[in-house]
Amino acid sequence: MKFSPAHYLLPLLPALVLSTRQDYEELEKQLKEVFKERSTILRQLTKTSRELDGIKVNLQSLKNDEQSAKTDVQKLLELGQKQREEMKSLQEALQNQLKETSEKAEKHQATINFLKTEVERKSKMIRDLQNENKSLKNKLLSGNKLCGIHAEESKKIQAQLKELRYGKKDLLFKAQQLTDLEQKLAVAKNELEKAALDRESQMKAMKETVQLCLTSVFRDQPPPPLSLITSNPTRMLLPPRNIASKLPDAAAKSKPQQSASGNNESSQVESTKEGNPSTTACDSQDEGRPCSMKHKESPPSNATAETEPIPQKLQMPPCSECEVKKAPEKPLTSFEGMAAREEKIL
């Protein structure tokens, strides 16, 4: 019954490592051997007890041999003590072995617990890694989407670059055209400057003739001869309707040069208006009608006016050179506008 703790510990050790099992098997073998030795010793003791009984029975017969028997008994007692001492030593050895096995079992349990904690920690690490893998997969998917978007944008940019290259070629071609146009414009400007000089001289001559005509009409004086106006027959005076329409254009272009002549004309016109009230109607009313028609309706003031020819009735052919030189001004403005627009675009 003293070996019961070992029997209680044996069913608790199936979870140990194979090394512990081997140790237990060795211990069990040793215990079996010890039990066998004990059984043999017990048998021997029983035999000795039987022998003692037989000796006691035979004491009477062996009184003579008491001394020899005593010596034998003492020997047997000594042997029994020795056997008891041996049994005690064996029990102590078994107890020490049981303690060692219990300590080993505790160590194995500690290792098992440590392994369990490590397994739990590693499982947590695995879960964390799985979560990180999921997040990385999501990031990869988003990165792939962004890569697709960037690829589409790069394709668009490449298409735009191709368009810009073609646009550069077109711009170079247009620049060459612009250089040609600038050269043509320079030539046209030179020609227009020459034409403007001729036109200014013609306008001055026409203004002088108009002034003379107006002064002669308003003051009932005969007009000067036509030879003083122009030498060429092609450069004849325009009719008053054309003169009235063209005078503002010429005045707008030559304001700084002809300010003094304009002041003189205004003073002369005011003086003539005071003399003849019919001229105010010519200036204030319908500008489209010629002044000669309005002047006819007014009665003649002197007899000399009837005999003298009326200058307004003389309708001279328009100056063809003035009209021809007036037309190139519009292309000039259009060319200048086109050049300015193309410069802004560049």
UniProtKB/Swiss-Prot annotation:
Positions in coiled-coil regions: 16-211
InterPro entries: Luzp2
Glycosylation sites: N133, N264, N302
Composition-biased stretches (Basic and acidic residues): 286-298
GO terms under cellular component: extracellular region
Residue numbers spanned by region Leucine-zipper: 164-192
Skewed-composition ranges (Low complexity): 250-261
Signal peptide bounds: 1-19
Keywords: Coiled coil, Glycoprotein, Secreted, Signal
Composition bias type Polar residues, residue spans: 262-283
Main location: secreted
Subcellular location: Secreted
Keyword Glycoprotein: yes
Region of interest (Disordered), residue spans: 221-240, 248-346
Protein name: Leucine zipper protein 2
Source species: Homo sapiens (Human)
Recorded name of the encoding gene: LUZP2
